[in-house]
Curated annotation (Swiss-Prot):
It holds the Pfam family HHH_2. It comes from Synechococcus sp. (strain JA-3-3Ab) (Cyanobacteria bacterium Yellowstone A-Prime). The keyword DNA damage applies. Belongs to the UvrC family. One of its GO terms (cellular component) is excinuclease repair complex. Residues 21-100 form the GIY-YIG domain. The gene is uvrC. This is UvrABC system protein C. InterPro entries: DisA/LigA_HHH, GIY-YIG_endonuc, GIY-YIG_endonuc_sf, GIY-YIG_UvrC_Cho, Hlx-hairpin-Hlx_DNA-bd_motif, RuvA_2-like, UVR_dom, UVR_dom_sf.
Length: 621
């Protein structure tokens, strides 16, 4: 079908009748089969039909979309929650031009508690692993420095495991001696007792610090009555630490003790900046920012999309019972039903007009306006830097897509390459790529930066398409690295691409065919932009190199276990994700890994716990 449905009423009506009145997702395609829009509804038929009534309810942008629709597809789901999750996945996969698309602003950090382990770890991460259903993620948090400070303070208040893996095989480390750790590595505390401590820590990150303080005060009083003064003093110190944490972590809002989220936005011609405030027990405990392109969307639709994105991966305990919105949402009933089902209790979405709730929305909106102004200043600064870059490098126009490449290794060991991408002067991390160097000439004791750069260039640019063609390529290095890359591009017929190298010492810019490097003043906007691009490539390559080196070192430990070949080592690492978790796993957990079995699990366990070999089974009387 290449004719728009709007031009063929009979076909349109036939297509609409095929759509069931059930929950699900619909996809609208144009004459080239491109997906223009993805939507969801409790009743697919009535929602899709509403696009073709032309009653004036549609925005001008959506009206432009409707006249292009040549085909409508639908996917029926069992319920609204499945429809919302599917819609979210399809939008992220296909990036339809008429959907509200959130920009890759930043990955906020989370706090993870690994309840899937007998002795749960508590750590900060920017990557949520959704396949471990028992693990809990708290956040996201906008200030990673404050999160690190909070976690550090929590680890001083409560005795928790301080290391991901034991320092010694046969004895606890200094953290046990000074009371910072209960001796997890040597089994000096039972999993049940340790998990009770971790549950108290979880209350802090669920916004239940006041409740935890009340609980500890009751225990302190009870311990004092029983003349257990050592325990009472320990509870007293924990209470003081929690009160200090509460003072440093939260901002009180006037005339409120409620827990709710509030969301508002500010827009200009190009973008929308959205702010979401998280209020728990009358205190502001978190503030999140989102950025969306402004393509003529209804502001309420943008807010709705952000809420879907945010709560999609939230733990149910993180969803408040009340969410305040700047505008009335078009799918409010749908979202309330989905959130209530996810939380297991009623969740209300309100667009307040007066009193304290409206004042909170006004506060969020003011912060969104400030963020929009900051974002606009940043965009103008980057635009000026790109114009300057085009000027000094003789480019026909300011480059939009910039790519940088770096190599990282130690004397040829664990050699890797990195590709980072900036779009409009800002990192576009969804386009970053990492490369393991495969060249046999690059091996421990034999490094070859030129060959490594050539390999990465060949692997990247042999697969280049018109959609990901860079406007500028930057190599971390000097003349030699630049020549190696240009030789590969010449083989591929791509030597017309603008490629440059930036040397670290003098920050000299090398250009193909020019024996003299270009030197720019230290504060030149073009130089500063190239330095940021190069430094990001270096950071990304170094992080990947360290990861590969760590994996190799972990694998070398596993290689010492008899009967544990490469394939089984890989299965163990995939199941537990780190050597530290393998070391503290029980025999039963090890045996559950496919391909391991009880016998090999016992062998692995005894390798890390040699004291277990001396424990004889009890004999029958």
């Amino acid at each position: 079908m290449t004719v728009p449905l709007i031009q063929n009423p009979e076909v349109l009506e036939s297509r609409l009748k095929e759509i069931p009145a059930e929950p699900g997702v619909y996809l609208m395609r144009d004459a080239t089969d491109q997906i223009l829009y993805v939507g969801k509804s409790k009743k697919l038929r009535s929602r899709v039909r509403s696009y073709f009534r032309f009653t004036g309810d549609l925005s001008p942008r959506i009206q432009r979309m409707v006249v292009q629709v040549c085909e409508i597809e639908f996917i029926v789901t069992d319920n609204e929650s499945e429809a919302l999750a599917l819609e979210d996945n399809l939008i992220k996969t296909y990036q339809p031009p008429y959907n509200v698309l959130l920009k890759e602003d930043k990955k906020y950090p989370y706090l993870c508690i690994t309840w899937s382990e007998p002795y749960p770890q508590i750590y900060i991460t920017r990557h949520r692993r959704l396949n471990q259903n028992q693990d809990k993620y708290y956040g996201p948090y906008t200030d990673v420095g404050l999160l690190r400070y909070t976690l550090g303070l929590v680890k001083r208040i409560f005795p928790l495991r301080q290391r991901p893996k034991p320092l010694y095989k046969d004895r606890p480390c200094l953290n046990y001696d000074i009371g910072r750790c209960p001796g997890v590595c040597q089994g000096l505390i039972s999993p049940e007792a340790y998990r009770k401590t971790v549950a108290q820590v979880a209350m802090i990150f669920q916004g239940q610090t006041d409740e935890l303080i009340r609980e500890l005060k009751e225990k302190m009083a009870q311990a004092a009555q029983q003349e257990n003064y050592e325990a009472a003093a320990r509870y007293r110190d924990q209470i003081r630490g929690l009160e200090q944490l509460g003072q440093s972590q939260k901002v009180s809002l006037p005339n409120s003790t409620a827990s709710r989220d509030a969301i508002a936005l500010a827009m200009n011609d190009s973008r929308a900046c959205i702010q979401l405030f998280q209020v728990r027990a009358g205190k502001l405990v978190g503030r999140l920012g989102f950025v969306a392109e402004n393509r003529g969307d209804d502001p309420a639709l943008i807010l709705q999309r952000v809420l879907q994105e945010h709560y999609q991966y939230c733990d149910p305990v993180e969803i408040p019972s009340e969410i305040l919105t700047q505008y009335e949402l078009p799918d409010r009933d749908f979202l309330e039903s989905w959130l209530s089902q996810k939380k297991g209790r009623k969740v209300s979405l309100l667009a307040p007009q007066r009193q304290s709730k409206a004042e909170l929305i006004e506060l969020v909106e003011r912060n969104a306006q400030l963020e929009l102004a900051r974002s606009q200043r940043l965009a103008e600064r980057e635009a000026a830097a790109l114009e300057r870059l085009a000027e000094v490098l003789d480019l026909p126009e300011p480059p939009r897509r910039l790519e940088a490449y770096d190599i990282s290794h130690i004397q040829g060991s664990d050699a890797v390459g990195s590709q980072v991408v900036f779009i409009d002067g800002l990192p576009a991390k969804q386009h970053y790529r990492r490369y393991k160097i495969r060249n046999p000439q690059v091996r421990p004791g034999h490094s070859d930066d030129f060959a490594s750069h050539a390999e990465v260039a060949r692997r990247r640019f042999s697969k280049m398409t018109s959609e990901d063609q860079p406007d500028l390529v930057l190599i971390d290095g000097g003349k030699g690295q630049l020549a190696a890359v240009m030789a590969v591009l010449a083989e591929l017929g791509l030597d017309h691409l603008p490629v440059f190298a930036l040397a670290k010492r003098e920050e000299e810019i090398f250009r193909p065919g020019d024996p003299e490097p270009l030197r720019l003043p230290p504060q030149d906007p073009a130089r500063l932009l190239l330095q940021r691009l190069r430094d990001e490539a270096h950071r990304f390559a170094l992080a990947y190199h360290r990861q590969q080196r760590k994996l190799r070192q972990q694998a070398s430990v596993l290689e010492e276990i008899p009967g544990l070949g490469k394939q089984r080592q890989k299965l163990l690492m995939e199941a537990f994700r780190s050597l530290a978790r393998i070391q503290v796993a029980t025999e039963e957990q090890l045996a559950q890994v496919p391909g391991i079995g009880p016998k090999l699990a016992r062998q692995i366990y005894r390798y890390f716990h040699p004291e277990a070999e001396t424990e004889l089974p009890a004999t029958a009387e």
